[in-house]
Amino acid sequence: AIVLTSSAGAGNQWYKDGAPIGGATATTLNITTLPGNSGSYTVISTVSGCASLVSVATSVTINPLPLVTPIVTPATTTVCNGSTVTVNVAGSQAGINYELFNGGTSLSSTTAGTGGAINLVTSALTANTTITVRATNPVTSCSVLLTGTSVVTVNPIPVTPTINPVGPVVVCEGTAAIVLTSSAGAGNQWYKDG
């Protein structure tokens, strides 16, 4: 809340945009930070039936936050170490910038909202990551995290396998079958000529 304080110890009446605020007669005025409470605030002190002049006005501007409701996908995904992830923000706001974060660390450049869906691409990920999306109004600097997140599991890259026997292998036609063995115990895919 924003707290305005009157120099008068008693008899205060607070005003917003020239209209008295009901029940606002204390030395301090607490203003909740909602955009509808933006305005010009003044105070008059009345003691023994005598009213002071109107105070100098204090202007209060409360800028709205970007919407937190655009949908973030994928909710979960799995990638290999060193890969990037493309995060889709559906229903972005025009005039709002979006950026991916992991905690306080930025994972992407900013992308301007269009009023529709936008894609943001992370930097290379090397560990399990919970991606959040920060929406920022570049004019007011007001920002908020979207409610949706993207949880990324990052799997390690296997060690490059070796082949036994080491080539080149040269035999005559009709020779018994050649058996090549991979050092990797699982997950093999063999290729010929590339």
Please provide the spans of the model-predicted regions.
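Surface-exposed, flexible coil segments in extracellular/virion-facing regions
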Residues: 15-33, 104-120, 179, 191-194
